[in-house]
Amino acid sequence: MATIIEMPELVLEKVIAFLDFKAVLTLRQVCHDFRNFIDDLNDSKLPDSKFQEIKFVSDDRRISFGLEESKKRFTCISYSKGQRSFCGKTEFFGYSNILNVAVRDMEMILKFQKTILERLQFEFHNVQLYGGSLVHTVPIKLSNMLQKLNRNVKTRTLSIKTNDPSPIMQILRFVDPGALKTIELSSLDGKMEIEIDEFAKTEQWKKADGIHCGFNVLNLNLEDICHFSSCSITLNSITAQELDFLRKTPQKTSDFSFFCVVLSLLHGLKNDFWTVDRYGKC
C-alpha cells in the first residue's frame, strides 16, 4: 500500500494549501521526506501565516520569536541551552547549532508570510549564546538568511534595538522599500552614537514616511530628513543655520504633518531640548 508521501506532488500541494502555518510546521517535523518536500515548495504554494507582528530577540543566553496573529493570538518560540520550545513541546538540538536552528526557523516563518507585516522588530542584546556564538554573529546569520530568501520582507514598521550599529544596515537593506512606512532605531542602553549617512543613502530610508532615532545621531545632513512626515532625531549639537533650515522646512514641504528634532546639550546634569513643530516654530 502506498504511503502518503508517495502521493502525487499536486495532491500533496493541495493538502498543504488547506493547512495553516502551525499545521504545516508540525507536518514538516513528521519525517525527512515531508520536511524536504515542504522546504522545496515555491513560496506561492505555502499558506499565508498572516502574522501582524514578528519580534526577534537575542537576550540573556537565549533567542526568542514573538509571533502575533491578532491582539488575542500570540505565539512564542524560544531557543536556549540547545533546545527549542514551541507550543508546549521541547526539542533538543545540542549547544553547537541552536543558533542555526533559530535562523532556519525564522526563514521558514518569513516564507509563510504573504501579507504585509504591521511591525518587524529585532532586539540584539550584548550576550553570549550557548555554544560560544557571540551576539554579533546573530545579525550576520540573519542577513545571510534574508539574502538567501531572495525577496525583501514586507513590513510597515521596522524596529531595531541594539548597542552595535552594524546590525541596522544588515537588516534594513532586505526590507521592501515599497511597503516600509516607519523606521525605528534605538539603543538598548541609551548611550550609543551612530553615523547615519550610509542609512540615508538606501531606498528604504528615502521612501519611508517616518524616522525615529533613540540615540545620538552623527554626520546628519538635514536634507536627508526633510522628506519625512514624522521625524524624531537626537543630536549633540546644531548650528544656527541648521536651526533656521529646520524652521523653514515645514513651510516648504506640504506633506509635513509632524516634524520634531531634539537637540540635547549636555552641561553636567542639565539637558536642554529644542523642537521644531509642524508650523516651523522653534
Regions found by a protein language model. Give the residues of each.
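Non-core capping and flanking segments associated with repeat-based/extracellular domains
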Residues: 1-282
